[in-house]
């Protein structure tokens, strides 16, 4: 693995351990040339996924972009990083096991919305406002009414 600090190709693994519910390996590495230390993650990739954008353009699936989407929606919200990682891993696993190699971006967006709905209502509304292209206050009101109806159904079911 190339050192991100000096570019040396000769790095050494100092520690390896399972991470993210045993779906990846976390490796601590050190560069003998510059002494730099860094962490890498190794994940199983079942197939190379391509995302089909609304414009028709195809891009490789980027797990880190998915993580950033969650982080933006959840900014300043009380949700642990581990819960974000589990949600992202679940989405990536479902996409990889779907049998499809080309996934519409809309499908990924729907899965993110579903995950955010169970993580944090505020983050769900934030993401929905961008994903569904809200342009009026009524759009927010409709989503909030949808959340309130779900809460009422859950409360009635638990009573």
From Swiss-Prot:
- Mark the unnamed zinc finger spans by residue number: 3-34
State the family named in the UniProt similarity comment for this chain: Belongs to the NrdR family.
Record InterPro entries: ATP-cone_dom, NrdR-like_N, RNR_NrdR-like
**What terms describe the molecular function in GO for this protein?**
ATP binding; DNA binding; zinc ion binding
Q: Which protein are we looking at?
A: Transcriptional repressor NrdR
**Which Pfam families does this UniProt record tie to the protein?**
ATP-cone, Zn_ribbon_NrdR
Q: Where is this region: Disordered?
A: 1-22
All copies of the ATP-cone domain together span: 49-139
Per its UniProt record, the required cofactor names are: Zn(2+)
Lineage: superkingdom: Bacteria
| Skewed-composition ranges (Basic and acidic residues) | 11-22
Which NCBIfam families is this protein grouped with? Answer: transcriptional regulator NrdR (TIGR00244)
Q: What does this protein do?
A: Negatively regulates transcription of bacterial ribonucleotide reductase nrd genes and operons by binding to NrdR-boxes.
| Keywords annotated in UniProt | ATP-binding, DNA-binding, Metal-binding, Nucleotide-binding, Repressor, Transcription, Transcription regulation, Zinc, Zinc-finger
Q: Which GO terms describe its biological process?
A: negative regulation of DNA-templated transcription
This entry's comment on the bound cofactor is:
Binds 1 zinc ion.
Species = Agrobacterium fabrum (strain C58 / ATCC 33970)
């Amino acid at each position: 693995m190339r050192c991100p600090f000096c570019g040396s190709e000769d790095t050494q693994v100092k520690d390896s351990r399972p991470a993210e519910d045993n779906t990846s390996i976390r490796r601590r590495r050190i560069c003998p040339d510059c002494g730099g230390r860094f962490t890498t993650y190794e994940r199983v990739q079942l197939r190379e996924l391509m995302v089909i954008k609304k414009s028709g353009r195809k891009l490789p699936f980027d797990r880190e972009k998915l993580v950033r989407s969650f982080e933006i929606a959840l900014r300043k919200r009380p949700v642990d990083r581990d819960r974000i990682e589990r949600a992202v891993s679940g989405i990536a696993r479902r996409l990889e096991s779907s049998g499809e190699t080309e996934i519409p971006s809309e499908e990924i967006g729907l899965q993110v919305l579903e995950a955010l709905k169970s993580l944090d209502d505020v983050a769900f509304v934030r993401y929905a406002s961008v994903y569904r292209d809200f342009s009026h206050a009524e759009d927010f009101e409709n989503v909030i009414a949808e959340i309130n109806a779900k809460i009422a159904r859950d409360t009635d079911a638990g009573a």
